[in-house]
């Protein structure tokens, strides 16, 4: 399943990590700027405090959702104040299923 997680904050990163555990999923994380560069270079590092472990996931990243990009699922994990900017981008995209998290 091709999955995009739109937003690389705490929720988005945890969701991307969880979805990536199923090897049938091809997870792409939409991140921008310096944070995208860190994920590309070092992987998505999560420190799990309760489990007392650290995981590093290598996954695809992108900094844009183009209208012609098609995913089976798009999880939207942006902050409420960012939705007004994100909704036109989602509307222009050809993917059918959008799940808003948060």
What are these regions (language model features)?
Residues 53-58, 62-102:
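Rossmann-like NAD(P)(H) cofactor-binding subdomain of soluble oxidoreductases
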Residues 1-51:
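NAD(P)+-binding Rossmann beta1-loop-alpha1 motif at the extreme N-terminus of oxidoreductases
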């Amino acid at each position: 399943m091709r999955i995009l997680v739109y937003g690389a904050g705490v929720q988005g990163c945890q969701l991307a990590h969880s979805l990536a555990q199923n090897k049938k999923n091809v997870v792409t994380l939409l991140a921008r700027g310096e944070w995208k560069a860190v994920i590309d270079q070092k992987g998505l590092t999560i420190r799990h405090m309760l489990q007392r472990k650290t995981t590093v996931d290598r996954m695809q990243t992108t900094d844009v959702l183009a209208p012609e990009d098609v995913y089976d699922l798009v999880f939207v994990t942006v902050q409420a104040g960012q939705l007004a900017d994100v909704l036109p981008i989602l509307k222009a995209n050809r993917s059918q299923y959008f799940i808003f998290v948060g």
